């Protein structure tokens, strides 16, 4: 809503929900596909659901990774750009490794969640970026390079 109404960025108003909802769907499909049970003895309380890949790890990479991309696109101050990126990467790692510490996931679950999140985010950004360049080229050919779209 912010990107569509306030910033007038149609493509970011599409990117955020597509990446988030698609990530949730992909995570659910992967969990059903692998059907791996959680560790037997959690540190606190037992949690229902499947273990592989870690949904928290995958969605933290997806969401905070998208924020990192926004930071690099919109923040010009080099100090703030690196500080925010570093803090978001640390947050992603803490979320992932907290799942192992709490014995809710195995190490491989978290690593697979990180990998799935990186792959999903990269794929979405690439596809939506190509769609954005293609739509700009159709509206105003001067806005997009001929080499941007195959």
What does each of the following model-derived ranges do?
Residues 40-150:
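Membrane-embedded catalytic cores of phosphoryl/pyrophosphoryl-handling enzymes
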Residues 1-50, 66-73, 82-84:
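Hydrophobic alpha-helical bundle signature of multipass membrane enzymes
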